[in-house]
């Protein structure tokens, strides 16, 4: 850390960026929490000035998530009531934040028999669920879904017709520490739920996932394990007898780790730590979450996995703004500092996730390959889509390999993470093989635009693994028609190739792209491709 100096005069009229830069100079990201009184005093002054700078821009007038807290989505209550009438309903993770609220809503809608299976068995269900006023309406089991026999006992005794599968690790940061537990819960726990739904004739099963799975590729344990679970459900929907549905949640306000942490620091008068400036989250509330879960019962169809999400998530909210509001609300003169990104939150955003040619139509939880399946419900509040196609054979092989590794108690946790990421990569590669070359080229082109990356503070090398996967999917499939369909001109294609040439690990693929460019410019007249459809030209060996 650098020594402090009085910034009051120099930064009285400074911009946000200048003040943030000064804070980071004083306490570089990655440093421990500052303890030096002089540095803390300077941080207090800088934080107060940053609050004024935000206020000057019309911010911090109200709680940043106010609009999210007041939102709701239409609940197809009549259809849901009809669906659950007389049915036994099982909720894994029933004593978590969402599970608890779901139980209350189901009771309100007339459910007469609800089963909760949760590792953390609650001690006072009557107090936790005030609507629990009918003898025997809710039964609580202390069960880890990874324990097949324990879960089987519940299915054997209770015979649930409807299952909501919510049990999972909820903290991305903790997932990077408790790797084995996170992966086994997502992989083995999900497999147990699906298998028992089929064996005991469940009618419907709804899975709660995360918007982080809209990333094509991820090395984060939390998101990668959820992607594997999504693929398991997609397979079950195609091959099983039950009807499967899925919900993608984003940041849950009532269950927000960073909001809780910031509020506690402000209440205690302590230094408030923020991961980094310019970090944004999209959020939703519990009412939206539970309505999505219940509506999924209504919109799910046999033989296909449809996932639902809130249609209008609003503008993303900056976490720094939330921290400053918490301090302002406390009435205390508290300092902030930027601790740096932690494992589970480090992955940079990949611009190719969305189709930027239609910026007003982007949905933050649906990627380019899922977007063609997007449908808005009749009420206009909810959107549904489907996963991009992938190889079931590849999934089976990767799940089998992963299961054999994670069942070995001596297998190192860090190796479990590597195996998880490698497995997800294989399934993603199979999905890209199904995808059109036009879509993959469009994703690649928009994903590594140097000027845009500079604005995000990232560089092409930060996306090496997803670039490798995209190039693998494109290899041998490019021609002029593909470039035209992707909206990529010959000059833009050449610029793309030059940008990619800076990545050492893909030089063979860059050589292929150069061959394509040369072939299309010198061998095939451009007019030929605008007058008639052409066959894909494999030019792997073109000089």
Please report, for each region that a protein language model flagged, where it lies by residue.
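N-terminal Rossmann/SDR dinucleotide-binding element
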Residues: 2-162, 512-515, 519, 526, ...
